[in-house]
Structure formats: structure tokens, C-alpha cells
């Protein structure tokens, strides 16, 4: 166990070194590699949170547009990805703050944030596969309103809400926000996934009401 953990740490360090000392330097015009590395460290601590460009800019002593440009560069190099809030008004949704996640969810230290990032990564891979395979156009968003009700993920199919996913570490009762947003979006399915709940052999995409399901069960039915 200790040997595997040590190997994991060594691999992460090597991968990070390659990203910042070679890929970022060679594939972009960014000169301040040290500051971008600091940004990456801050993003790893803020996974699953709204991106506050101004706050990040103040911490790193650069402009907000520079932070946005650097995050885009890190996204292009598959270090992180952002999710936009869903809105029927597409222009309006693009103005709002996105959420940030890492492609390598093992770099996230906080357990709850790491679990949410784990689900986000698998959902993103699934929608990319479905779209590339010609099943339709799929996108991944999150939901949040002015009353601060929130659901972690919304998958859309051809621009229409398809299913919601709320991620919980423990086996808890279904979040009221999941019921609320399913009613508001008219999504066909809604799931609250439990990371601790053991796998059960059941089909998730049948019942229309919100379901409490093991993460393993839902993820096994995506691709």
C-alpha cells in the first residue's frame, strides 16, 4: 500500500514537471511559468467551486484577463476543465462564473471535492463519447439559482435537459434541490450518487423520480 502511494506521488510529480517545464513552455507563449504553476495549485484547492477570476488575479498579482487566458491554456493541456451553469438563455449562462475541475482527480486533497471531481471526469468522458459516436449533441453543466439552490451536474441531450446528478460522499437522503431542479428543468432522470454505497445490479434509466444510487452503478451504465 505504501509502495503504491509512493509511486503515485512520484508519478504525479513527474507529470506536473512535464506539464510546466516542457508542455506549457513549448506549446504556449506564456513566460511566467512559476505563476501559472501557482495558479494550478490554487485551482486544485478550489475544484468544484465557482471560479473567481478577480480573487485569483489578486493572489497571483496579475490581471483577471491573464488568469482567464492561463486557465484556458491549462485546459488545452488537459490539466483542468470548466463547466458552465445551465440556462435556457445560452448567452446569459456564458456570462456567469464557471466551475473548475481537474482531469486528474487524484490531485484533489479534500475527499468531498475529490469525489465530485471523480464523477465530473466520468460524466465528461461519457458525453464526449456519446457525441463523437453520433448519438446526438451532449453537454455537461451545473445548476445554481439566485436562492443558492444547486445540483452538481446536468447532462443535456441536443440542448435539452436529460438527467441530473448530485454527488454525496455518504449515504444521505435525497437533496431537496434535486427534486426542485428536476421539476424546473423537466429532466427525464435525476440521481443522487453515493460514493460509499456498494454496487447494486439495477437499471438506473427507467424511473423518472429522483433515485439514490451507488456511484459504481450509475457510472457502469454510462458507456
Can you say where each PLM-predicted feature lies in the sequence?
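Accessory nucleic acid-recognition modules appended to NTPase machines
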Residues: 3-161
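Conserved beta-strand termini and adjacent loop/short-helix elements that scaffold enzyme active sites
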Residues: 83, 143-145, 193-195, 215-216
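Hydrophobic/aromatic beta-strand patches that form the interior of the parallel beta-sheet core
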Residues: 101, 141, 165, 189-193
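Arginine/glycine-rich "motif VI" loop of SF2 helicases in the C-terminal RecA-like domain
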Residues: 129-133, 180-188
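Short glycine-/acidic-enriched loop or helix-start segments at secondary-structure transitions
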Residues: 152, 175-176, 202-203
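Active-site ExK catalytic segment of metal-dependent nucleases
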Residues: 161-171
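Active-site-adjacent loop/helix micro-motif of nuclease/hydrolase catalytic cores
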Residues: 170-179
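Domain-level recognition of nuclease-like catalytic cores that cleave nucleotide substrates
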Residues: 197-223
